[in-house]
Every structure is written in structure tokens, then in C-alpha cells.
């Protein structure tokens, strides 16, 4: 006789960081409630939850929305413990937010959570105008992903509901990734 055992969803904590007004909260609300918030309300801290299936496994995501404003620099790191993955966000329409990925956010999350995987997220994809120097290009995003050793880059639009599912699937995959074996030779002590 075999028992039919159903695995319960694996809980994961995903913490979202980035400059204020890059669209972190809109991304979370649109993803979890399937509605785009038209009004901007600055976030101090907020939590959202949802279930997701990735690669034939169920997960329960707790999504921690953090404040990007400098006023909350001392409070924000209190949300970092037990994080399984960071979504490091910048707005495709803001070069300053993109530059802050490397100068502010990457150093901050590495200081508090050195080995937690990161998915780099370019928000407000719907605003990009091709061949405009004002906007961050996909190539620049890919280069930044390599420089900060992020698991992946996903560009999305909360307003158009474009690539939102992929953002959270990649966060789960970043947590579940297996270390790559570079050599099959064993260590020998002589």
C-alpha cells in the first residue's frame, strides 16, 4: 500500500529593494492582486503573500516591500534577515536608480546578507523609448547583472502586466539553483 503524500508549499521570503518611486510597490500589488494602483503612496514597510508553482513545485511567497527613501536607511535592513532572495529593482526610465544599483543597493544587501541570491529587475518597461539615451537599455541591464553577479535580469511592466510572472519565477529559481560542479577531480593530500 502506498500513501499519497502531498508536499506542502515551500515558504520563501523575497525582499524587494531599490530607489523610491521605481515601481516596487506597483509591481507587487499588480502581481498579487491583479490590479495596477494608479495612486502613488510611499511605502515604509509592507508585506504581500501569494502562491506560485515553478518547475513542478509549489511555493508560498512572502513578499517584503521596503522603502527606498534615505529616511528609512536604518530601518530597512531590519527586513533583511531570513530573506531567501532579493529583487533588486531600478526603473528603466531613471538612470539614477540604475546607477544606485551598484553604488548603493548592491553594497547594502551584500553587507547584511552576503550569500543571498539576487534577481535584477528593470521596472517600467512600458516607458522605454527605443534609441533614447534617457532610458536604460537591456544591454546595460545585462552588463550590470554580470557586474553584480545577479542570478538573472528581468525587465517588466506592472502597468502592462508584462513579465511579472517571470520576475517571481526567477526569484524562486535563484533560491533553488544548484551549485555548478567545475571539476570532477577529488582533492588529494600527499
From Swiss-Prot:
Propeptide: 188-190
Entry's Gene Ontology cellular component terms: cell projection; cytoplasmic vesicle; cytoskeleton; plasma membrane
SUPFAM superfamilies on file: P-loop containing nucleoside triphosphate hydrolases
Biological process terms in GO annotation: actin filament organization; border follicle cell migration; cell chemotaxis; cell projection assembly; cortical cytoskeleton organization; establishment or maintenance of cell polarity; hemocyte development; hemocyte migration
Membrane-topology descriptor: Lipid-anchor
GO molecular function: GTP binding; GTPase activity; protein kinase binding
Binding annotation for GTP: 18-25, 65-69, 123-126
Coiled coil: none
Annotated motif Effector region, positions: 40-48
Name of protein: Ras-like GTP-binding protein RhoL
Species the sequence originates in: Drosophila melanogaster (Fruit fly)
Amino acid at each position: 500500500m502506498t500513501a499519497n503524500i502531498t508536499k506542502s508549499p515551500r515558504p520563501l521570503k523575497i525582499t524587494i529593494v531599490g530607489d523610491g518611486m521605481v515601481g516596487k510597490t506597483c509591481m507587487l500589488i499588480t502581481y498579487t492582486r491583479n490590479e495596477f494602483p494608479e495612486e502613488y503612496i510611499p511605502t515604509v514597510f509592507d508585506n504581500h503573500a501569494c502562491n506560485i508553482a515553478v518547475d513542478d513545485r509549489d511555493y508560498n511567497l512572502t513578499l517584503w516591500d521596503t522603502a527606498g527613501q534615505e529616511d528609512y536607511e536604518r530601518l530597512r535592513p531590519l527586513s533583511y534577515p531570513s530573506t531567501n532572495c532579493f529583487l533588486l529593482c531600478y526603473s528603466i526610465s531613471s538612470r539614477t536608480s540604475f546607477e544606485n544599483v551598484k553604488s548603493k543597493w548592491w553594497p547594502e544587501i551584500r553587507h547584511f546578507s552576503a550569500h543571498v541570491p539576487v534577481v535584477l529587475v528593470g521596472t517600467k518597461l512600458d516607458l522605454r523609448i527605443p534609441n533614447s539615451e534617457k532610458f536604460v537599455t537591456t544591454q546595460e541591464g545585462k552588463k550590470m547583472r554580470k557586474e553584480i553577479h545577479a542570478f538573472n535580469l528581468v525587465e517588466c511592466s506592472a502597468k502592462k502586466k508584462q513579465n511579472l510572472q517571470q520576475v517571481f519565477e526567477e526569484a524562486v529559481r535563484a533560491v533553488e539553483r544548484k551549485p555548478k560542479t567545475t571539476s570532477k577531480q577529488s582533492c588529494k593530500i600527499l
